[in-house]
């Protein structure tokens, strides 16, 4: 049971002004919550994991994959926005999602609202919560969707209120903010989305709002009526819409818009080719629904996902919620119409767009919608048409018309608002064609609110739309099949852009360079690849090749990308004159004028040439007016020039663009107080733990980039003064050591860092390569520095150098389980299994309570061909630890089956609740194998009834394993048939002498099954 307690805060009392119709308050709600285990202590590096069709990176985050059955009441801060029509609740603690949304006029939850918190293994890092609205940037089910994000609130002169949520994500170092606004006298929920690339590198990003709604047999997805086709993930399959196969490549067609018809499996369908700007869903049982509206050019993605009306769907309902029922996701994509579908974000670029949702009711469906209203026009029978309008705003003396060509069939003046809808049945003459009908709602002044003209497709759907299905993607071919360098370049670019986990874009680029070593396009991409790895000399080599080709015969290049990135390489390696030459050359073309001038401004600021720096940053802002990094640099420069009033104006501009911008807050504190003392006051509304540390270090790096080391140190000192998480962070302490000018003081700080825990300290920036190199020079025998340096190098792609640093760390401190494990992991990836096991054994000796060590090392044992009985002894030696972690238990169960200890395996599987990743099913395969192996052993003993029971158990899908049953059930006969096939195969291959005897046993078993069924 929830209890809501308003937070006693004068701030929120001031915001809670009923007269302005929008109430904003923060409440504490106590919600039953399934606890998530502690995050994984070992860093998890990328080894090719595919997640949501793209690279499934964990590092630089930690893994949160231990779900529990422990339910505790937990307090959450929920920020509520409401007026007389709607109330929504935003939950900063779990990703900043919209957690609650209710239409107060009919108590309809227009977003799926959880009454409990029950995470499952669906998120990029593991723990994930269904329901509400999740902001997925720059990847689907983004890494931090179950973490606290930054948040703040705003009130506006028109009485509207906004809650801003956002973060600086760690994988690509992109920043995003979403402002969620409710307006007076309106049912609209508006999201102002900002996706920001503050880095000097081009990045790829994906945006989807993952919107969930309650559904049942009477729920229908509403794609725009001009949608003729749907497509699956990656556009590998198309179907007619709405009538198509419920299972891909199946002849049986159903109406795919109805949840009830998905009786086989889960499904995702993306709308294809719509020129309308809305998508929605309608519950005919409640006569209510949800609609989303946005600029279709900026927000083209329209998709639904459902677990479906089938046994697997029912199981997922239980996994994700104890009592809140079925849900369906009505997703919408910004700059993306599929998943994965990434687009490029230039250095310093900010993308800004708006989305609007509102509840609808009483109009029995939706045919079109704008942010102001939704319309339904539906053919009933005998010439009757149902016409309905639902408004998201209040309108008096509005006008509704229905026309057939020039003939007006209905013309009414009405009052309409979110609580008062319009619904009427109109007689339409029999000679009127549906496509000749037209209806519109205008306000009292004649401004169009929404209109609709029926779309007519002859024989639409049922595979008879009159048009062929759109072409599926060709897919990326093997490198050798591409005939031209251009094709190789474009294939590699797509692999890079889409963060493809299965392919390496460098394979395509390397082949292209074999054919044409000086191809400019390919050399630029390879240069950028090496920049990301901080391989500066290699980056320079390829960028110079590109520059040489582009500027042949003293040509002023049409594309100055090579100049820009060369300038950045030289700036990062201290070659100032060469950096300046190339950055100025990059300003010659519009595409790189903005980031090049920014880098030139930063370089001038480093030399305290503030007047010059100001001019240069202004030049950058001419083509990148909303670049928050450039604006904050300008604010910093103005402060250094003593122009405080002008700096304040820039701060106001920054906050008007992104109220959650962090660096400018530090500058504002320096402007007002001459110190970073504001930091403590912002903590309640900012991220926590390692995310808070990394966001702080982004600011520190920004100050270091402009040569403001004293300010960078002041930020760290203020953070350390606050205490945890900053004071106990090795990373924070090592940054401080690096910034201290006195080497003895630096050594002292390194000593403090070395006494702290390394868990969760995950360096991630290419700027840190130089820092750790310098720290290693100051204290070459420090194991912590070597360990963290290794993490950084391995993560950015310098794997051999990273492994070398880990080896040094393990040699310097053999008691470090983290370092020993990392060496074991690295050696295992290289294929040196004996050396890997040597280090894993050392790690287990140092930390016998870490179950990941057992899971990972058993995989190495398996690859190395270690006998199963030895693997069993190894795992059983740490049985108490192994049993803490599903992955380790699964390794043990597999070994038990190999060693004939299936009874032990069955006992564990009968009593343990496994929490599996979405799409995972290995535990059920093990379960089936255990019972079949046991059944076979009983069959050999001619214990037919007991064998039959084991085979029957093998056909089941116990709920505690969390593996959904297939739509078509498996029978004992199926099991026997498979065993007979296996027997025949073995006889054909090996001439098995026992075949006749075993076949006879199977005959006896089949006979017994038939006898029992007849009874």
What function would you assign to each model-found segment?
Residues 509, 543, 583, 617, ...:
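Hydrophobic/aromatic packing residues within the alpha-helices of TPR/SEL1-like helical repeat arrays
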Residues 493-494, 528, 568, 602, ...:
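Residue-level recognition of tetratricopeptide repeat
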Residues 27-39, 43, 79-80, 86, ...:
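A contiguous, surface-exposed recognition patch within enzymatic or periplasmic domains that forms
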Residues 44-73, 78-80, 129-187, 312-343, ...:
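Extended, loop-rich substrate-binding clefts of extracytoplasmic carbohydrate-active enzymes
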Residues 366-483, 662-664, 670-681, 738-767:
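Long, contiguous interaction/recruitment modules in multidomain scaffold/adaptor proteins
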Residues 486-487, 521, 561, 595, ...:
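Start-of-helix register in tetratricopeptide repeats
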């Amino acid at each position: 049971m929830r209890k809501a307690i308003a937070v006693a805060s004068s701030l929120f009392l001031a915001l809670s002004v009923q007269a302005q119709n929008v109430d904003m308050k923060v409440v504490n709600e106590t919600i039953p919550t399934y606890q998530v285990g502690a995050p994984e202590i070992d860093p998890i590096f990328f080894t090719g994991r595919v997640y949501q069709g793209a690279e499934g990176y964990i590092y630089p985050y930690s893994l949160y994959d231990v779900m529990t059955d422990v339910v505790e009441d937990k307090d959450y801060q929920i920020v509520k926005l409401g007026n007389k029509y709607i109330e929504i609740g935003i939950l900063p603690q779990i990703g900043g999602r919209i957690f609650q949304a209710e239409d107060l006029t009919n108590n309809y939850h227009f977003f799926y609202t959880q009454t409990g918190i029950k995470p499952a293994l669906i998120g990029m890092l593991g723990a994930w919560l269904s329901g509400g609205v999740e902001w997925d940037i720059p990847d689907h089910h983004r890494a931090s969707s179950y973490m606290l994000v930054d948040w703040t609130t705003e009130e506006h002169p028109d009485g509207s209120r906004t809650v801003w949520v956002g973060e600086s994500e760690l994988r690509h170092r992109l920043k995003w903010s979403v402002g969620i606004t409710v307006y007076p006298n309106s049912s609209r929920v508006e999201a102002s989305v900002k996706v920001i690339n503050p880095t000097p590198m081009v990045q790829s990003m994906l945006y989807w709002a993952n919107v969930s709604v309650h559904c049942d047999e009477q729920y229908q997805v509403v794609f725009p009526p001009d949608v003729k086709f749907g497509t699956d993930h990656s556009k590998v399959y198309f179907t007619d819409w709405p009538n198509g196969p419920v299972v891909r490549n199946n002849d049986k067609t159903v109406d795919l818009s109805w949840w009830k018809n998905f009786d086989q499996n889960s499904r995702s369908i993306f709308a294809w080719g719509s020129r309308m700007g809305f998508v929605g869903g309608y519950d005919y049982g409640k006569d209510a629904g949800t609609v989303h509206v946005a600029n279709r050019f900026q927000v083209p993605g329209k998709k639904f996902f459902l677990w479906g009306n089938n046994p697997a769907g029912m199981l997922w309902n239980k996994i994700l919620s104890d009592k809140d029922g079925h849900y369906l996701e009505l997703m919408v994509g910004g700059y993306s119409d599929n998943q994965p579908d990434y687009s490029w974000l230039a250095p310093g670029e900010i993308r800004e767009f708006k989305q609007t949702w509102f509840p609808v009711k009483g109009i029995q469906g939706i045919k079109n919608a704008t942010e102001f209203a939704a319309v339904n026009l539906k053919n009933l029978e005998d010439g009757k048409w149902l016409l309905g309008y639902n408004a998201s705003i209040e309108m008096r003396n509005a006008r509704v018309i229905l026309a057939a060509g020039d003939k007006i069939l209905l013309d009414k003046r009405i009052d309409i608002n979110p609580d008062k809808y319009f619904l009427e049945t109109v007689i339409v003459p029999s000679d009127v064609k549906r496509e000749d009908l037209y209806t519109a709602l205008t306000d009292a002044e004649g401004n169009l609110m929404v209109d609709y003209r029926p779309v007519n497709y002859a024989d639409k759907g049922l595979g008879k739309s009159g048009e062929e299905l759109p072409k599926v993607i060709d897919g990326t071919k093997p490198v050798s099949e591409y005939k031209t360098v251009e094709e190789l370049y474009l294939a590699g670019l797509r692999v890079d852009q889409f963060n493809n986990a299965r392919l390496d874009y460098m394979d395509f680029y390397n082949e292209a360079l074999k054919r044409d070593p000086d191809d400019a396009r390919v050399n630029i991409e390879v240069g950028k690849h090496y920049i990301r790895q901080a391989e500066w000399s290699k980056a320079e080599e390829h960028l110079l090749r590109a520059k040489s080709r582009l500027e042949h015969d003293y040509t002023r290049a049409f594309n100055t990308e090579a100049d820009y990135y060369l300038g950045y390489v030289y700036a990062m390696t201290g070659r100032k004159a060469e950096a300046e030459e190339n950055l100025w050359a990059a300003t010659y073309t519009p595409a790189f004028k903005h980031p090049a001038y920014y880098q030139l401004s930063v370089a001038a600021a480093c030399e305290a040439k503030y007047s010059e720096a100001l001019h240069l940053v202004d030049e950058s802002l001419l083509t990148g007016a909303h670049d928050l990094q450039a604006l904050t640099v300008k604010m910093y420069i103005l402060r250094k020039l003593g122009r405080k009033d002008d700096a304040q104006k820039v701060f106001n501009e920054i906050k008007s663009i992104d109220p959650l911008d962090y660096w400018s807050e530090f500058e504002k504190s320096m402007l007002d107080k001459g110190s970073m003392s504001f930091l403590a006051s912002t903590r309640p509304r900012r991220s926590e733990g390692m995310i808070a540390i990394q966001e702080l270090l982004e600011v520190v790096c920004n100050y270091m980039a402009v040569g403001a080391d004293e300010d960078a140190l002041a930020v760290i000192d203020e953070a350390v003064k606050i205490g945890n998480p900053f004071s106990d962070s090795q990373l924070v302490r090592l940054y401080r050591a690096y910034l201290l000018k006195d080497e003895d003081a630096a050594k002292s700080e390194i000593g403090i860092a070395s006494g702290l825990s390394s868990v969760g300290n995950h360096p991630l920036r290419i700027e840190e390569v130089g820092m750790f190199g310098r720290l290693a020079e100051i204290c070459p025998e420090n194991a912590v520095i070597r360990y963290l340096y290794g993490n950084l190098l391995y993560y950015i792609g310098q794997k051999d150098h990273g492994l070398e640093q880990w080896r040094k760390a393990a040699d310097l401190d053999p008691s470090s389980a983290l370092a020993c494990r990392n060496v074991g992991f690295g050696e295992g990836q290289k294929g040196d299994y004996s050396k890997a096991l040597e280090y894993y054994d050392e790690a287990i000796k140092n930390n016998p309570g870490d179950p990941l060590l057992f899971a990972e090392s058993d995989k190495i044992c398996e690859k190395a061909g270690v006998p199963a009985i030895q693997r069993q002894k190894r795992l059983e030696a740490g049985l108490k630890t192994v049993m803490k972690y599903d992955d380790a238990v699964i390794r043990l169960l597999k070994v038990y089956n190999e060693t004939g200890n299936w009874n032990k395996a069955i006992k564990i599987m009968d009593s343990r609740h496994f929490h599996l990743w979405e799409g995972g099913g290995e535990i059920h395969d093990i379960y089936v194998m255990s019972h079949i192996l046991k059944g076979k052993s009983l069959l050999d003993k001619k214990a037919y009834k007991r064998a039959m029971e084991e085979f029957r158990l093998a056909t089941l899908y116990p709920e505690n394993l969390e593996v959904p049953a297939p739509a078509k059930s498996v029978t004992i006969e199926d099991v026997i048939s498979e065993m007979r096939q296996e027997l025949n195969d073995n006889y054909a291959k090996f001439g098995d002498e026992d075949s006749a005897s075993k076949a006879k046993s199977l005959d006896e078993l089949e006979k017994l099954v038939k006898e029992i069924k007849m009874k």
